[in-house]
């Protein structure tokens, strides 16, 4: 008996890929759904950070959908995932961003969280201390910078 394995096609991705939210293009329409003031703050800052890259954004819907609520003590402050892959499973048509209001965060931490989760919508993965030695990337998990560093911006340019 022969066994067959189905493999998804390989795709080019950013330098520190998140393996799951490769945007379908460089023009992303963003829509928030019944956000709290903190969720709105995070979304607005995340959108502004994307604008620093090769990705242009607009308000509307169809590309990035943003939600926030108390998701409980589940270990995450924010989460980004693809809810609608294109027909070939090579890029994401709709990316969902969720902010967890369960945690008490400062205004600066909400901005950092927005930057971080919107970084995932640009196909950025998490950074580690070993490749962010000056602690200035919002893609780090252990610290709370509020901006992408040049490495992040270069990775977005290369991967989208």
Residue locations for each model-derived region?
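Zinc-dependent metalloendopeptidases
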Residues: 11-160
């Amino acid at each position: 008996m022969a066994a067959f394995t189905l493999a998804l096609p390989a795709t080019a991705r950013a330098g520190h890929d998140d393996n799951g939210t490769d945007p379908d293009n460089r023009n992303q329409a963003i829509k928030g759904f019944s956000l709290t003031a903190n969720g709105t703050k995070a979304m607005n800052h995340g959108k502004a950070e994307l604008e620093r890259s090769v990705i242009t954004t607009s308000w509307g819907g169809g590309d990035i959908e943003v939600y926030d609520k108390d998701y409980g003590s589940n270990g995450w402050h924010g989460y980004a995932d693809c809810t609608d892959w294109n027909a070939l499973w090579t890029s994401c048509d709709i990316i969902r961003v969720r902010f967890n209001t369960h945690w008490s965060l400062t205004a600066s931490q909400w901005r950092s969280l927005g930057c971080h989760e919107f970084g995932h919508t640009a196909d950025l993965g998490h950074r580690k201390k070993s490749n962010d030695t000056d602690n200035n990337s919002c893609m780090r998990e252990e610290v709370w910078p509020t901006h992408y560093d040049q490495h992040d911006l270069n990775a977005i340019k290369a991967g989208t």
